[in-house]
Every structure is written in structure tokens, then in C-alpha cells.
Amino acid sequence: MKNPYAIGKNIYLRTPTIEDAEGEWYQWFSDRETTKFLGDRYLPNSIDQQINFLKYAQEAKDRIVLSICKIENDKHIGTCGFSAINWFHKSADVSIVVGDKNHKQGPVTIEGMSLLLEIAFKRLGLVNLLSVHVASNPFTPLINKIFGFEEVGRIKNFALYEGEYMDSIISQLARKEWVARNQ
């Protein structure tokens, strides 16, 4: 393991590197299958853009980006983290993208989200997490249900998906509910 920040059973999370940005990471965010439910899926990505994002994220005070890596071989298979962090209100948006097609919609997403929630509520002292997804996304609601997120709002016709405007759904997980479920 290289500089682990959080360690699970099969994966660990660490700070992203230039090598990550120059590797497969930038390709994931040009891949239609990987990005079809992401808000910025319409624009192609490049190595230079990924490196610029990495540099921005490292300097940002309201964002934490982590690389998802396999413990067995240190392979970088995804990215996750927190954005729109409000240190005063102790809240953030949470996200996870498994880019490696051999690990999509499987245990990596569950284990990654579990590690993120532990980081948010135990290490960072956050009180509320938000998860936002387009209504046509079938995967995020399943993950949210597993971890106890509750739908708290809906923005009508907000996100363009496949030529149609869809609702954006906002779900919340409060620290006290997470603690009650994980005692």
C-alpha cells in the first residue's frame, strides 16, 4: 500500500498522484458508460485536464479527493471523496466513481462508501452528508438505501440526460443516524 488514508478489506483510499492522473483516471471521465450519470459527462477529458483538476483539488479547502486502490496490487481503480465541504455547518457532498470496468457496481462501491462515511463522521467531524443523483440513475438509490441515506429533496427538470431533462434527487445522511446504525 502506498500512503493509505483509509484501509478496508480489499481496497484502500489514498491521496491521488500525478501518476494516477496520467494513468487510466483521465480516461474514465471521457468514457460514456462511466460518466453517463455525472453532471459533467458531456465534455471530453485529457491528461492535462486531469492533472489540472488534481492540482486544484489539492489546494481547495472545500474538497477532498481520494484514489481507490486494490490492496492486493495497489492498482488505482476509482476515485471518491467530498465536495462542497462547509466546515462551519459540518456538511459535504459525497461521491464515488469506480472507473475500472472489472470492479463496477460491486463490492468496491460498497466498501468505498463505507470507508468514506467513516472518514466523514469519525475523522472529519462532519454532521451531514448529501448525495445528489439524476432520477434516471438506478445505482445511486441502491447504495443510498444500503447506507441509510434519506431523500430530502428534488429539483425538477434540472439535469440533462439522453436529451431529456430529469429531476435531481438530493438525499441526506446525518451523523446521528449513521452512528445509531453502526453501534
Region spans (language model):
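A short helix-loop-beta-strand connector motif used in the catalytic cores of GNAT acetyltransferases and
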Residues: K55-S67
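Juxtamembrane/interface motifs at transmembrane-helix termini
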Residues: L43-I47, Y56-E59, V98-G99
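Acyl-donor (CoA/ACP) binding surface of acyl/acetyltransferases
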Residues: M1-A21, D31, V65, C69-Q183
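Conserved GNAT-fold acetyl-CoA-binding loop/helix
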Residues: E33-F53
